Each structure stands twice: as structure tokens, then as C-alpha cells.
């Protein structure tokens, strides 16, 4: 939005002010207006519908509920679907802490899993992804699911299903083991307030390794794009005028 607004020429006297104030302010107001008066209503309706649907699943059993919550938590890595699942568990942390016992794990397995994947099979990832993997593990430990976004953006068809499967596995284990998380958050940072810490930690490892192994099985080795170009240049160097 700001990039498009910069096409509007301002007087020379306002150019400096435009970059640091006018363009960002107008861009924020326009974007916020679109969300509040445009797409905000439909998105809110969808989220409310998902929340009501989750509430109706209270009697279906722990494994189906854990599977659904785990899949939703990992699906868009901090997006609207993730927020519905996490808020559903967070708002009941006082009465049903076992929900956060599972969701707390599902929150962190996507980034931790992708970080582990880069360590297990570094040839399948480029330099940027390897560096992102180190940061992803740390982000997962403090409950930030968004650490997996760079990997999903580069290869969504292989990464997102792997994140979902790992989160489902990670969510089911605490549900069945009776783990209770008394904090409305996830990751390893909440261990001090978790009842059943060993199972919680096992679930994080299990979900992370399932994600890592699955995504590495699906991905091919990464090939540097410049490799082909370097070969071509070497071939050109070997060409002589005699050959022409």
C-alpha cells in the first residue's frame, strides 16, 4: 500500500515528511479501513463459526479434538485459523487446562520441527533457510509459531502438511497423558507451570521430529541456481577462435 502511495508526488517541501509520516499514516488508515469496514466482518464471522464448531466438539473424545486443534494451530502458523484454535484453548485455561497442555505443544512444533529438519538434512535447504532454522528453534521454544513461515512460503505443498502432522502428533500425546498447562501460551518457556512436564517435553520432541522427518522425506536436495550458470561460463572460457 505504501509503495503504491509513493507514486503520488508530493511538493518538495513535504518529501521528507512524506517518507516518515504521511505515506505510513495514510497507508495504515487505508489498510485499517479495508479490514474494519470491508473484509473484517466476513473474517470475524468465519472465526466465530469455527469457535462455535470447536465448542460443539467437547464430547467427541480427546484424540479427535486434539487432532483438530493441532491441525488448526499449525495450518497457517499464527493466522486466523491458528488464532481460533489457540484462543479456544486459552480462554479455558482456568477450567480446562488440558487444552493448553496440547495446544501449547502444537504452537511450538512447527518452528522447532523445521529447525530440526535443517540440521538433519542440510543439503535440502539453502543458506537462508539454514540460518532461519536456527532462529526457528529459538522461536518455537518461546511459543512463536511464525518461525516456520519462511519455510512454508518457499515450499508450501511439502512443508504445511508436515507441520500439520507433527502438530497433531504433538497435540495428541499431552491430551492422552493428562498434561495440564496453566499458562495461556506454548513452547518450552511454559514448563514451570506445566503439570506433567516430562510428557510435555516428549510431545514437543515427538512432534518436532515427525515434522522434520516427514518434510525431509518429501523434499529433494537443494540445488544452487547459480551452479548451472557457472558451468556455462566455464564452457565459454574453453571456447577458442580456432574452434569457431
Put a short name on every predicted segment.
Residues 1-243:
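Pore-lining transmembrane helices
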